[in-house]
Structure formats: structure tokens, C-alpha cells
Amino acid sequence: MPNPFNQQVIEEFRANGGRVGGYFEGARLLLLTTTGARTGAPHTTPVGYYPDGGERVLVIASAGGAPQHPDWFHNLLANPRLTVEDGVFIYEADAVVLEPAERDAVFARAVEADPGWAEYQAKTDRVIPVVALHPIPKDGPPHVNAGSMAEALKVVHDAFRRELRLIRKEFTAAVGTDGTRTPGVPLGAQLRVNCLTLCQGLHNHHTGEELGIFPLLADRHPELTPALDRLRREHERIAELLEELRRAVAQDQQDTDPGRVLSQVERLTTELEAHLTYEEEQLIPLLTSPGASR
């Protein structure tokens, strides 16, 4: 059974699609359900994570700089297979503890994004481990934390909105009001990875819509053709903005113009928000109508 604080976070996370307030407000969180190393019982705990530019995500077994590794880390050493909840999707993953060289590089990236990790490391003699979570491929659609196609669409869209808000906040912290980099705050490697992960996620989402839900709705609702055509055009426009953002953040750090990148993030935010809202207005009523299925 989680401690009372963790249990409150878990319940709030599940009730609000991954959003929590208080101490963890605005944080990137996962729920990890591991198998107890001694008991074999399931054990769920909230853990902060970092995107890694692709399918895997990274978690840090800091335990706040405590002398001992957290229980969930011991569980993963004994049983690497776990269940991950990210607020949108629920999936099985395999945990891999990073080897020293990769661990050091990733931990440095995390410290650059949040110096608190260095403070945790300074408090303990143990080397704080970094763990990569690799999703297990599965047949069929992903397990979305939603009860219907309409709810799933909204949950996924809200996750993109939330991640884009976080990235905008991170860029704002790294860019001065005059469009120059804030002294002492680099345009860090993890922020670049966050952007690239968002770009890939949006590409995957739009590709899935065009191969799945759009043809389904076009067959059932021919009157929706003009709206679907508009949505496809907007997908093309957003793809152009994503490619511009990819190229900008892929440049060498010294060549990156942080003010220019921030303006690209702002433009993407404006156009994506309008697109998501229009898509919801057009599709959700049809997805909630009688006969619509998951």
C-alpha cells in the first residue's frame, strides 16, 4: 500500500488524466506499478520522468538523496517488467538500468534541466541510478485511459496541450525578455529532447488519425468531408512547423537563436491550439452519437 501522500497523488493523477496539483503541479509524472521483490505484490508509486526523444522514457531513482535506493528500484532489479501510466496511455514496459557512461551523460542532462538532481546526489554516497523504460510492443491500438473514442481524443489532445505549455515555460526560462538567452540558463540538451519528443508524438498522432479515425468517420458521415479536408490541410501545416522546430533545436547549441526558437514554439502553440479545438468541435459530437464505438 503506498504511503498516504503517494496514495493521494495516485488518486489525483488517475482522476485527472495525469494532472496533479500541489508539490507536483506542472511536473512530468508517471505511475509505475512494479512487482514487489520480496512479496510479489503490485506496488504503485508516482515518479518524475524525462522524455528521451523516442519511445523510451527515463526515470531517476533519487529517493530525494536518501542513503538507500527507493523500493520501486529494488523491485525493478528483481522484476524488470512493469506497468506504466502516463495519464493518457497504460502500457507494459521493461526497465533497463543505464550503464555508467550513458547514466552519467543522461544524469548531466537532467542536472542541466533541474539542478535539484545534483543536490540529491551530493546528499548520498550511492550513485543515483537512471532507468530507461522501454514499452513492450503490442498488437492492436494502445490502451488509452478513456471510456470512449470521444473521450480518448480529448485526453490525447489535452496531453499535447499540457506538454506544449511545459515546453513554452521551459523556453521562457531560458530566453530573456529581449529575445536573448538568460545569463546562466543555457538552452539545454533536455529541452531540445523535450521538443523533439513532442514533434515525434504529434507526427505519430496525426498519422494515426489519417489512417484510422478519419477514414472511419468519412465512411459513416459523408457530410464531414469538407471538415476532414480542412483537418488534413492543417496537419500538413503543423508538419511544416514541426519540421522547422526540429531543425532549429537540432543545431549546435552555440548556433541556436533562442529567441527565434521561442517564436517558433509560440507560433506552433497558436496554430495547434486552434487545430485541436476545431477538430474536437467537428469530431467529438459524431464520436459520442449512438452507434459510435471505441
Regions of interest found by a model, annotated:
Residues 40, 76, 120, 275:
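Hydrophobic pocket/interface hotspot
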Residues 9, 74-77, 99:
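Glycine-rich, pocket-lining loop/helix-strand segments that form or immediately flank
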Residues 49-51, 74-75, 84-87:
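Short, charge-rich binding segments
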Residues 27-64, 194:
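Short beta-strand segments
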Residues 55-82:
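Compact nucleic-acid interaction/catalytic patches
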Residues 35-37, 81, 116-117:
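Short beta-turn/strand-loop junction motif enriched in small, turn-promoting residues
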Residues 2-35:
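Short, conserved active-site entrance elements at the starts or edges of catalytic domains
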Residues 27-30, 56, 85-98, 102-119, ...:
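Small-residue-biased structural context
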